[in-house]
Amino acid sequence: MYMRKIIHIDMDAFFASIEQRDRPELRKKPLIVGGLPRGRGVVATCCYEARRYGIHSAMSANRAYKLCPHAVFVKPRMVLYKEVSLQIMAIFREYTKKVEPLSLDEAFLDVTEYLQINGSATLLAREICALIKLRTDLSASAGVSYNKFLAKIASDLKKPGGISTVPPEEARQFIDRLSIGKFYGVGKITKSKMQSLGIQTGKDLRQYSKDFLMKRFGKAGSFFFYNARGLDERPVCPYQNRKSIGKETTLVQDTNRPEEIRDILINLSSLLGKALENNSQLAQTLTLKIRYSDFTTTTRSLSLQKPFSCPADIEECLPSLLTNCNLTHKPIRLLGISLSKLTYIGSAPRPIPLPFPKDRRSNCLNRFFAIKEESP
């Protein structure tokens, strides 16, 4: 039987570890990377010292401060994190072309061909983690198994800096003991539904038929059925076609001031234009998202006949989307823009990349908001 060798490598507290690496005075202190506690920010990540206080990613910075008042808060340095991530991904590709990044700090590696017949994936994972430490001075954990499902779960077992292996002959016993909340795709709601059926572990899950699970959980039920039996045929995909990209920002203070709204939209357009350029992509549909101070949310979408790629094109679409939005009646809390119907350059007609000057880029929004531009 053909058996794959899959490694899942996950950096340990990636953002926080970079900050502690670069600033030795932050080591062994409860460090939180993200928003500041007096604002509306959230925790992007935190070091293991901070996790002992119950702090975790996506928690509000204010809540994190209450749990640990002496924690050190630092703002993210995303440009640096992306640079380090590229360095780590390059290390992975020294061993295999089959690398599937899941985020800046984790990836799947299919090392089946590299190891050929008798090579040890566990020893290789140890070698890769050691090389990451040597070149970046950062710690990584790894999970090794014959499919993605088990490799990803295994990588979390001995954090930080550990390596866990689930060989085929031990998979069933491993899954039997596995808490249902550890299964891929099982969030709080699904976990609650499963527990109401008496499903607490992988062993419990395996007692149910595929048809039953699909009736209760839709298409995900089929995935749960096979995972409970240690089966996951998903390949490691080096290039994933993203269906959309988006950027949004939560304002420090609610506002309906035209100048602030304009500046935020221009910034979001620039970020998305850069993302399209970096990914060699074009977009054809733009969606604007507005969340007001009362948490009501409005979205407006526009599809163009020809794909676009530059910030000026994005900005010129916005006035028609803003026309039907209530921008003055109540303050705005959040603004976001997303792009969809993405195609890669070469598979679609490419627009002519004109060097649009900055004044043209902002004129369309200025006219919409009736803002009088300052004379030079």
Curated annotation (Swiss-Prot):
Q: Where in the cell is it found?
A: Cytoplasm
E.C. no: 2.7.7.7
Q: Which stretches make up the UmuC domain?
A: 6-187
The keyword DNA-binding is assigned to this record: yes
Identify the keywords attached in UniProt to this record, alphabetized: Cytoplasm, DNA damage, DNA repair, DNA replication, DNA-binding, DNA-directed DNA polymerase, Magnesium, Metal-binding, Mutator protein, Nucleotidyltransferase, Transferase
An example Pfam family from this entry, by short name, is IMS_C
Respond yes or no to whether keyword Transferase is given for this record.
yes
**SUPFAM superfamilies recorded for this chain?**
DNA/RNA polymerases, Lesion bypass DNA polymerase (Y-family), little finger domain
Q: Which residues bind Mg(2+)?
A: 10, 105
Q: How is the cofactor bound?
A: Binds 2 magnesium ions per subunit.
Instruction: Tell me, in a sentence or two, what this protein's role is.
Output: Poorly processive, error-prone DNA polymerase involved in untargeted mutagenesis. Copies undamaged DNA at stalled replication forks, which arise in vivo from mismatched or misaligned primer ends. These misaligned primers can be extended by PolIV. Exhibits no 3'-5' exonuclease (proofreading) activity. May be involved in translesional synthesis, in conjunction with the beta clamp from PolIII.
Instruction: Show the HAMAP family listed in the entry.
Output: DNApol_IV (MF_01113)
Q: What is the name of the protein in this document?
A: DNA polymerase IV
Organism annotation: Desulfotalea psychrophila (strain LSv54 / DSM 12343)
Q: Which gene encodes it?
A: dinB
